[in-house]
Amino acid sequence: MARIGDGGDLLKCSFCGKSQKQVKKLIAGPGVYICDECIDLCNEIIEEELAESSEVKLDELPKPAEIREFLENYVIGQDSAKRTLAVAVYNHYKRIQAGDKGRDARGETVELAKSNILMLGPTGCGKTYLAQTLAKMLNVPFAIADATALTEAGYVGEDVENILLKLIQAADYDVKRAETGIIYIDEVDKIARKSENPSITRDVSGEGVQQALLKILEGTQASVPPQGGRKHPHQEFIQIDTTNVLFIVAGAFAGLERIVSDRVGKRGIGFGAEVRSKAELDTVDRFAEVMPEDLIKFGLIPEFIGRLPMIASVTNLDKESLVQILSEPKNALVKQYRRLFDMDGVELEFTEEALDAIADQAILRGTGARGLRAIMEEVLLPVMYDIPSRDDVEKVVVTAETVNDNVLPTIVPRKPERGERRDKTA
């Protein structure tokens, strides 16, 4: 037992040696003592170590080309969107490492502003999956929010602060780590105001939500209710700084192509105008030509667009891309279903014609890559029901007829082993 001499019975800290008179508190353990000052020091050391481990270190941060290469393993096509995202993410985390400030060539301090991203494109083309794959690569907290569930403060629905709660939960309530995470807000086109002109009546789920999102997009100290729901007095809040949170805002923006076409078409009048045939105009990716004025006409307010300086567009997937999505990425659907069948000791095979037929069906349904899984489930459901109860199946072959004509997949029976033959003849 740690004691001080001179006949006194004073206890002392086993770590710093201070007596119980020199400190506020002395906590006893089995044969050891620790003072309040040493406890504070231990807490500081732990917090520093946790903060260091949660930071994305610049020397470990992949370069834009490496980020794009990683995305290639999981996402087919969308090269322009991959490049835009790779550069935006690299610059964002480089800015965090610089502590929001850097020095230019003349040695002057320059404040580095945040560049959030707006993603445009049809449904089922990989917008959400691109963002999820990015977060997985960088090992940062990632949260997905639906803009349609949000309303202006004081009305029925979710407050914008609930988006931040999802990020904090994804970081296991480690606020420091959450402050360098990524938030993906989907369906943002659904919060466009209903007309181009500001309305006299309140638009609580449209323009009101855009106004409410402005502060957290730009960077602010937000108060988040720990259990979600509405804020009320006498409630404790989690404080989170959104300055270093990267926001990726996305939507299908149906009808925006027409607004862009009208603007581009007006430029094609008069002498010296660039004349394009109808066939050329049909093949042009209108989302790649989007300007802020088009988004304002669509119903986004100028302040909201100003906080989303980077625009990445994704295009409709053609048949070739859909076939590649089925078989080539690391988590391709064909590989996933093969693994499921493999667990039952059965081999699964798709003919090339079958993959083409599945891609054709997805194009007909207009659901993009998202519809591929639904078609695969429909095609494989009968055999996935039967196979677990049978032990005489070697292989299942899916053909084009299986997809187009609802014919059952071809079942190749398992060859009996020699021992089994002897038993039958005995």
Curated annotation (Swiss-Prot):
Residues noted as binding ATP in the record, renumbered to the chain: 122-129
Similarity section: Belongs to the ClpX chaperone family.
Listed InterPro entries: AAA+_ATPase (IPR003593), ATP-dep_Clp_protease_ClpX (IPR050052), ATPase_AAA_core (IPR003959), Clp_ATPase_C (IPR019489), Clp_protease_ATP-bd_su_ClpX (IPR004487), ClpX_bact (IPR046425), P-loop_NTPase (IPR027417), Znf_CppX_C4 (IPR010603)
Official protein name in the record: ATP-dependent Clp protease ATP-binding subunit ClpX
Record's GO cellular component terms: HslUV protease complex
Role, per record: ATP-dependent specificity component of the Clp protease. It directs the protease to specific substrates. Can perform chaperone functions in the absence of ClpP.
Classification via SMART domains: AAA, ClpB_D2-small, zf-C4_ClpX
Domain ClpX-type ZB: 1-54
NCBIfam families: clpX (TIGR00382), PRK05342.1 (NF003745)
Alphabetically ordered keywords of this record: ATP-binding, Chaperone, Metal-binding, Nucleotide-binding, Zinc
Residues holding Zn(2+): 13, 16, 35, 38
GO molecular function, one term: ATP hydrolysis activity
GO terms of biological process kind: cell division; proteolysis involved in protein catabolic process
PROSITE patterns with a match to the protein in the record: CLPX_ZB
Coiled coil location: none
Subunit structure, interactors included: Component of the ClpX-ClpP complex. Forms a hexameric ring that, in the presence of ATP, binds to fourteen ClpP subunits assembled into a disk-like structure with a central cavity, resembling the structure of eukaryotic proteasomes.
Signal peptide start-end: none
